[in-house]
Curated annotation (Swiss-Prot):
InterPro entries: Swm2 (IPR031391)
GO CC term, one of those recorded: nucleolus
Swiss-Prot/TrEMBL GO biological process terms: 7-methylguanosine cap hypermethylation; tRNA processing
Species of provenance: Saccharomyces cerevisiae (strain ATCC 204508 / S288c) (Baker's yeast)
Primary subcellular site in the record, as a coarse category: nucleus
Entry keywords, A to Z: Nucleus
Disruption phenotype: Leads to cold-sensitive growth and elongated buds. Is synthetic lethal with a MUD2 deletant.
Protein name: Nucleolar protein SWM2
Gene name linked to the record: SWM2
Places the protein is found: Nucleus, Nucleolus
Misc remark: Present with 1720 molecules/cell in log phase SD medium.
Family stated for the protein in its record: Belongs to the SWM2 family.
Length: 146
């Protein structure tokens, strides 16, 4: 069995992390397991943090002129995995790329009969999923500690 997370593979990933020709944008979404394995090795972790700091510095100095926003997103994700917290010193970070995946025009769809199906823990269809829903009026002050 091939170990995808061996030292040389992880080192190669760090070598190509900032090169979109070596690791295209489409692969950014699947890098997290590699980042988690980089975090387990002190030398690779140190090297990764250095790469991220360098790119963050370039971004803060010159923005998207010198650093592709996708590289900054990768470094932000890597930083979060390695440090367990977000990098806060970045000026005008690139927008998140996962907010809108695709816009779909549904104006041409007419009389679409869509029904939400819900299943119980045994996989049986629930005919009326809100049948046992109980709504109660609750005083918010009961839950606020004074």
């Amino acid at each position: 069995m091939i170990d995808l997370y061996n030292y040389s593979n992880l080192e190669g990933l760090l070598d190509g992390l900032t090169d979109l020709n070596r690791i295209p944008k489409e692969y950014s979404a699947v890098l997290e397991p590699y980042f988690q394995n980089i975090a387990r090795n002190a030398h690779l972790k140190s090297r990764a943090l250095k790469i991220c700091r360098s790119n963050f510095h370039k971004w803060n100095e010159e923005g998207a002129k010198t650093v592709n926003p996708e590289i900054i997103r990768r470094c932000l994700n890597l930083w979060y995995v390695l440090k367990g917290k977000e990098y806060k010193k970045l000026k005008d970070p690139p927008p998140a790329d996962n907010i809108i995946k695709d816009e779909i025009d549904v104006s041409y769809v007419k009389n679409l009969n869509v029904v939400r199906l819900e299943f119980d823990e045994f996989g049986k269809l629930i005919s009326n999923p809100l049948e046992n829903l109980i709504l109660e009026e609750v005083e918010v002050n009961d839950f606020i500690q004074e």
